[in-house]
Amino acid sequence: MKQTTINHSVELVGIGLHKGVPVKLVLEPLGENQGIVFYRSDLGVNLPLKPENIVDTKMATVLGKDNARISTIEHLLSAVHAYGIDNLKISVDNEEIPIMDGSALTYCMLLDEAGIKELDAPKKVMEIKQAVEIRESDKFVKIEPDSQLSLNFTIDFNHPVIAKQAHHFVFSKTAYKEQVAKARTFGFLQEVNYLRSIGLAKGGSLNNCIVLDENSILNKEGLRCEKEFVCHKILDAMGDLMVLGMPVMGKYTSFSGSHKLNSMLVKAILADAKNYEVLIAADPAKEFALQKAFA
């Protein structure tokens, strides 16, 4: 398989979730071995996608370097991961990626519009060689060897609508677009009110978030699918795993995982070379599996 980028530049304008201000997003092609590079066009600062540049994971995954930050990168990166894009410039003129409808669906449509272009360099894939696990109280994230990417996620909320949900997702681009991309972020009305009181979630609304009160969903249209809550967590995890800089072959398992735990997992994987192998020229069986996944 070859490395990829996009065929041509595409752009959109949306609202940032926390600041609530318009943000212009531009995706541009990059050459081979350039990786994923974010760019603050208002500041003239490049922010390469690297684990050491992740500076905050409380409310979202935040990239930072010097005086520049870009927040809520995970939904766009999830789509980039699913489309198998290796090299891409992502420019924004403010400190957030636009939230759009709270899912990755808009970004999938944007990438479809841009098209995928092969480059004259072999694709790099990270194969997990031994289990790596991060725990925090009863919460955990874990990745272990597998011949494909699969994500097993369980959430458990003390809420009558969500309760306990689990989903086993075997990655393919097609399955991602059908099961995961449309799943929206969600939050609780009490938390939203608090966040707004401290100057956050100014761009949040029923148009870009599933909002729940104590007993029900406030969005009149309801859910897009039965497991939308846990599928959004899978969406987030795929975005956070993209911080590794390349597609991953491994079995990811999580119970009540978070951006924080995912970021810790990424750094733990890279901390020991025995945990992984970067496949430059995959053997025929593995290459066929990858081609099938990203078709």
UniProtKB/Swiss-Prot annotation:
Signal peptide: none annotated. Pathway: Glycolipid biosynthesis; lipid IV(A) biosynthesis; lipid IV(A) from (3R)-3-hydroxytetradecanoyl-[acyl-carrier-protein] and UDP-N-acetyl-alpha-D-glucosamine: step 2/6. The keyword Lipid biosynthesis applies. It comes from the Bacteria. Its EC number is 3.5.1.108. Catalyzes the hydrolysis of UDP-3-O-myristoyl-N-acetylglucosamine to form UDP-3-O-myristoylglucosamine and acetate, the committed step in lipid A biosynthesis. This is UDP-3-O-acyl-N-acetylglucosamine deacetylase. The lineage of its organism: Bacteria, Pseudomonadati, Campylobacterota, Epsilonproteobacteria, Campylobacterales.
